[in-house]
UniProtKB/Swiss-Prot annotation:
The gene is metK. InterPro entries: ADOMET_SYNTHASE_CS, S-AdoMet_synt_C, S-AdoMet_synt_central, S-AdoMet_synt_N, S-AdoMet_synthetase, S-AdoMet_synthetase_sfam. L-methionine binds at E57, Q100, D240, K271. Its cofactor is Mg(2+); K(+). It comes from Sulfurovum sp. (strain NBC37-1). ATP binds at H16, D164, G165, K166, R231, F232, D240, R246, K247, A263, K267. Catalyzes the formation of S-adenosylmethionine (AdoMet) from methionine and ATP. The overall synthetic reaction is composed of two sequential steps, AdoMet formation and the subsequent tripolyphosphate hydrolysis which occurs prior to release of AdoMet from the enzyme. The keyword Cytoplasm applies. The lineage of its organism: Bacteria, Pseudomonadati, Campylobacterota, Epsilonproteobacteria, Campylobacterales. It catalyses: L-methionine + ATP + H2O = S-adenosyl-L-methionine + phosphate + diphosphate. This is S-adenosylmethionine synthase. GO terms for biological process: one-carbon metabolic process; S-adenosylmethionine biosynthetic process. Keywords: ATP-binding, Cytoplasm, Magnesium, Metal-binding, Nucleotide-binding, One-carbon metabolism, Potassium, Transferase. Pathway: Amino-acid biosynthesis; S-adenosyl-L-methionine biosynthesis; S-adenosyl-L-methionine from L-methionine: step 1/1.
Amino acid sequence: MANEYIFTSESVTEGHPDKMADQISDAILDYIIERDPQARVACETLLSNGFCVIAGELKTAAYAPMQEIAREVVREIGYTDAAYGFDYRSAGVLNGIGEQSPDINVGVDQKGGEIGAGDQGLMFGYACKETKELMPLPISLAHHITRKLAAVRKNGTVPFLRPDGKAQVSVKYVDGKPVAVDTIVVSTQHHETVSLEQVQKAVKEEVIDPVLATYDIDISDITYHINPTGRFVIGGPQGDAGLTGRKIIVDTYGGSCPHGGGAFSGKDPTKVDRSAAYAARYVAKNLVAAGACDKATLQVAYAIGVAKPVSIYVDTHGTAHIDEEKIVSCVESLFDLTPKGIIDSLDLLKPIYKKTAAYGHFGREDMGFSWEKIDKVDEIKAFLGL
């Protein structure tokens, strides 16, 4: 008997308050790391009704104009009028950044250029064959819809849309393989004079339909919920407070694999919450691309101030084409998962982070992220004899 189930993932637009916070934190990180690649940055952002608070810890010789950076991010997102729920010109911006603890710094910066993990913790990476970019289909579809929502708003195709929005996609699986889209939920902020029918028609025809047309999957029997509450005028930080690091499942795999709990945005790459999660994706994707397995979950864990991982775990979910112990040995032999090894191999001391802060950190091959490369495939095949 076939094993059937429905799995759901969500995404949010760049104008969602939590994503606004992520983008501000990462824009500050980019500004600093471009001028001081050895900086230590832990930047958190809070957004609420008409104001923004920037907090955290820094160790850098660079000066960052926090107010200007934050306002420019908000402007780029599209909050250019107080009627939208936030205005980049009039919002108050409070800077509460402090200096990094010397106790943490001693453990991170070690002799000989080695870098200890910035904290203890566990991180996960994942890859599967559901899409060409080796990502789970539900989160891939959800991100595609939210990106399209922003695109048609910004290019004027649907001028009455506003920046805040969300999408959720439920996919039917049979024996572990996606076979049909079951339900799509979209909630989007809009101008107050627009009717629900106008919003529903525009979102279906200009956003959802073009996205679905790019996927080879059954779309014949989808249930649609577009602005199911009927009205979404008050949005952005006026509707809900936003905070860095509150969309960690949106940022990763949509719930398709475990999450270690550490957020990404605002953290320089000595923080293994971020860099090791990128490395884990890199490893998992290369294992699947090499044909070692069809699906891979990788866990890596660290102790603060210690460079080498305390554990590496690989789960192929029964899809391995070779002994799993050999796969673990392959990972340990071919991938340097120390913080310095990750930073060097993935070239992470660059201002690349704001681009990651909306629409997911993984599966976005068009952005040129180093952890999405499959340049270890030949080495893996040679090691495993594939």
